[in-house]
Each structure stands twice: as C-alpha cells, then as structure tokens.
C-alpha cells in the first residue's frame, strides 16, 4: 500500500489541493502499478508562521 505524505504551506484553495491529490494518486498508480484502492495520499497544511527555511518563516518571506 503506497502512502504519500505532502506538507504544504497553508493558503491554497481546496480545488488546488484536490488537484494535487489526484495528480499524485495518478502518478503513483501509473509508475508503480498500484491498485487505486491501495493508494493513500495525505496533504498536511502548515501555518506559514510555523515553517522556516533559511532562518526565516515562510510568512516572513512573503509566502
């Protein structure tokens, strides 16, 4: 059972997140030959104030 976990900064629309879920699901199915029912894709949205890169939060960087 393939499990894919994705972390993204909060702020994207539900339709964008659903499109990502579907695209990743399809990529796993097509590349690994996994049955649809066995594929799990989880997106975790992280507050930009709680995610840092290069010593600055994403919020500070304007993302």
Residue ranges and their predicted role:
Residues 1-63:
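A domain-level signal for the structural core that forms small-molecule/cofactor-binding pockets
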